Amino acid sequence: MLSPKKTRFRKQHRGRMKGKACRGNKICFGKYALQALEPAWITSRQIEAGRRAMSRNVRRGGQIWIRIFPDKPVTVRPTETRMGSGKGSPEYWVAVIKPGKILYEMGGVAENIARKAISLAASKMPIRTQFILLEESHN
């Protein structure tokens, strides 16, 4: 499971997910990618489930890059606790995803294999996503 080794503060505000992703919205490493179409919090467990689904499908061939990292702690209060008495303790980590953000990239495999593997990863995600290809620029 992905999580930061060390953070400056233990707890964070929830924040808002306004607008589109202006960074991390282009393919950088591979040839194929999975792009988010909706804003959401994606947990480290969901990221890991998607990675496992992809790597099991392609077996030894190809290479996978995870373009997101869960760096936001989510706090949960104990059950049957009255209101007040402070914020809950950090339970799990999430990555804040805006529309347009690249979640996974893939390379070194045929397009049909990449499409199948990325669709398996997409089924593990809590949001609508799309499969995108790297456009080769023709000079």
Curated annotation (Swiss-Prot):
GO terms for biological process: mitochondrial translation. The keyword Plastid applies. Disulfide bonds: none annotated. GO terms for molecular function: rRNA binding; structural constituent of ribosome. The keyword Transmembrane does not apply. GO terms for cellular component: chloroplast; mitochondrial large ribosomal subunit. It is found in: Plastid, Chloroplast. Keywords: Chloroplast, Plastid, Ribonucleoprotein, Ribosomal protein. It comes from the Eukaryota. PROSITE patterns: RIBOSOMAL_L16_1, RIBOSOMAL_L16_2. InterPro entries: Ribosomal_uL16, Ribosomal_uL16_bact-type, Ribosomal_uL16_CS, Ribosomal_uL16_dom, Ribosomal_uL16_sf. Part of the 50S ribosomal subunit. Belongs to the universal ribosomal protein uL16 family. This is Large ribosomal subunit protein uL16c. It comes from Cicer arietinum. The lineage of its organism: Eukaryota, Viridiplantae, Streptophyta, Embryophyta, Tracheophyta. The gene is rpl16.
